[in-house]
Regions:
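RNA-contacting regions in translation and RNA-metabolism proteins
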Residues: 1-299
Length: 299
């Protein structure tokens, strides 16, 4: 009889959480080790694996924590609830809790790109022309977004308006950088972004973070170049070594030129020096040709 009662209790606990993947739960931290953190949800416990924890967060015993349910497993000992602090869905759910317009369906989060503990970008859309989606998420004096940032332990959040116009969406996704032009290359799935020289570092972001998040948010590869780089490419586009693209070096976060022929990548300064050398060589060749022509005429 006791065994049946226990089985019935386990079944009730499982049914309480079955199908709740994608929900947020609030629990109290019980214990932490190298593998996972245990959250007390009341009647059951939740597992927060190390892989689902934000690197910079330090769970403190008895502290309350919100987490995102990623899986509910049925085991012989009862339900095993696996939660996450790194899932992009956590950000979406936190905004639902803080923004009534999202909970009511007036404002939608159309896309979300996240690097946990560092930065998140969300694209929002309003189904009511009288409601500003960005303003609704930010709140009066930033009160709403501040609550989300606090729960995420200071993670930066960029809120941009969603747009069906791809160039416009890419431009907004690279906020806070100011973009001059976006060219869509359908064949390669690339958005070529042109920015003023002084905006290049901001558009790329620290270690390429802003560009990466913008690419994930839009679903397109984002190739950022300054006006000077574009001018140089167009000037030397017929030169073999000039064929390639600007990419972000994952180790330094700086832009480097990757030749199309698979050669070694070069820095922006080296690219400019090489372009100047090419220009000088062309000038010298032109001067020699003119001198030869003049000599021929004199003869």
């Amino acid at each position: 009889m006791t065994q049946r009662i226990r089985e019935a209790e386990r079944e009730l606990k499982y049914e309480e959480y079955a199908g709740r993947e994608g929900d947020i739960v609030t629990g109290m931290i019980q214990q932490t080790d190298a593998r996972y953190t245990l959250l007390d949800l009341g009647r059951v416990e939740a597992l927060l694996p190390q892989s689902e924890q934000v690197m910079f967060e330090r769970p403190e015993p008895n502290a309350r924590l919100k987490a995102y349910i990623v899986e509910v497993r049925k085991t012989a000992k009862g339900p095993q609830i696996v939660v996450s602090r790194t899932h992009p869905g956590l950000v979406k759910r936190l905004f639902e809790l803080e923004v009534p317009e999202i909970a009511d369906g007036i404002v939608e989060i159309r896309a979300c790109a996240r690097e946990p503990g560092h930065r998140t970008k969300i694209a929002v859309y309003s189904n009511d022309s009288n409601v500003d989606p960005v303003g609704a998420c930010v709140g009066a004096r930033g009160a709403r977004v501040r609550q989300v940032v606090t729960e995420l332990r200071g993670e930066k959040i960029d809120i941009v308006p969603f747009s069906d116009d791809l160039p416009d969406f890419v431009m907004k996704a690279l906020s806070p950088a100011k973009v001059k032009e976006v060219r869509i290359i359908e064949e390669t799935g690339t958005a070529e972004v042109i920015v003023p020289d002084f905006q290049l570092s901001l558009a790329i972001g620290k270690e390429g973070q802003n560009a990466r998040l913008a690419a994930r948010l839009t679903g397109w590869r984002v190739d950022i170049k300054s006006e000077s780089q574009l001018a140089q490419e167009e000037a030397y586009g017929d030169v073999d070594w000039a064929e390639g693209e600007w990419v972000v070096d994952p180790e330094t976060g700086e832009q480097v030129w990757k030749p199309a022929d698979g050669g070694d990548a070069i820095s922006a300064d080296d690219w400019t020096d090489q372009a100047d050398d090419e220009s000088l060589a062309e000038t010298d060749a032109g001067d020699e040709a003119n001198e030869a022509e003049n000599a021929s005429e004199e003869e």
